[in-house]
């Protein structure tokens, strides 16, 4: 998540430069990750050395996420294989690139088989635009992501890693008032990559229910940490 304009970015590739002059951006300009990068740097639990396996995988993850959310045309997405790409969440049916682009990255990531009446957030009832607005409103500073561990080489056919995703609910979410507390979840991802380390298939596994439930009330740890209703941090 990011605002509409910005300078260079030290954690993501394919965001600025000559190669992006013809890129079509969803909001008309490259996103600005300054606020979320600040949160990331302040609250990350791992600081990987530049050029390390973990740093390379983290850069690929952040770049992939940026391109899926902010680049409109498939041909502008340089972190994924142009001909072969699919993504799945929690073992559900893999989605093609066209399906992901049509429904949006947020909705694809939050796919569920729960009956509609039990959904805190219903990705099937949201458009790309409404989903983006919903999460930008809830997390005005964004929702940071870091790689915690890598279980294989980034040059392998499969890259398996553990990640942490977090932010602070400082805005309303689907009618629920902001509680100012930290909202976070942990998960595991497997990137299937080609010989150029472009993602051909992305498989994410995480606890969706607990993540969304944390929008409804301040997490116990965050609530006890401060009496202030607005607490710091988000990406």
Swiss-Prot record:
Q: Which GO terms describe its biological process?
A: defense response
Under Gene3D superfamilies, the record lists: 3.10.450.50
Inducers of expression: By fungus Bipolaris sorokiniana infection.
In terms of InterPro entries, this protein maps to: NTF2-like_dom_sf (IPR032710), Pathogen-related_defense (IPR053218)
SUPFAM superfamilies annotated for this entry? NTF2-like
Keyword terms: Pathogenesis-related protein, Plant defense
Q: Which residues form a coiled coil?
A: none
Q: Which domain of life is it from?
A: Eukaryota
Name of the protein: Pathogen-related protein
Q: Which organism is it from?
A: Hordeum vulgare (Barley)
């Amino acid at each position: 998540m990011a605002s509409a304009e910005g300078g260079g970015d030290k954690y993501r590739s394919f965001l600025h430069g000559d190669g992006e002059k013809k890129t079509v951006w969803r909001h008309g300009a490259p996103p600005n990750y300054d606020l979320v990068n600040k949160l990331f740097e302040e609250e990350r639990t791992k600081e990987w050395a530049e050029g390390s396996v973990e740093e390379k995988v983290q850069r690929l993850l952040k770049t992939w996420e940026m391109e899926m959310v902010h680049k409109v045309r498939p041909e502008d997405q340089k972190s994924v294989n142009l001909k072969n790409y699919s993504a799945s969440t929690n073992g559900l049916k893999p989605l093609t690139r066209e399906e992901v682009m049509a429904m949006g990255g947020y909705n694809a990531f939050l796919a569920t088989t729960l009956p509609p009446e039990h959904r805190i957030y219903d990705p099937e009832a949201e458009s790309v635009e409404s989903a983006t607005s919903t999460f930008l409103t809830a997390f005005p500073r964004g929702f940071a992501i870091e790689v915690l561990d890598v279980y294989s080489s980034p040059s392998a056919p499969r890259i398996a890693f553990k990640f942490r995703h977090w932010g602070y609910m400082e805005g309303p979410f689907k009618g629920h008032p902001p509680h100012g507390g930290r909202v976070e979840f942990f998960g595991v991802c497997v990137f299937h990559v080609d010989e150029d380390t472009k993602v051909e298939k992305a498989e994410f596994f995480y606890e969706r229910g607990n993540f969304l439930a944390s929008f409804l009330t301040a997490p116990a740890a965050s609530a006890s940490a401060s009496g202030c209703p607005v607490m710091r941090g988000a990406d």
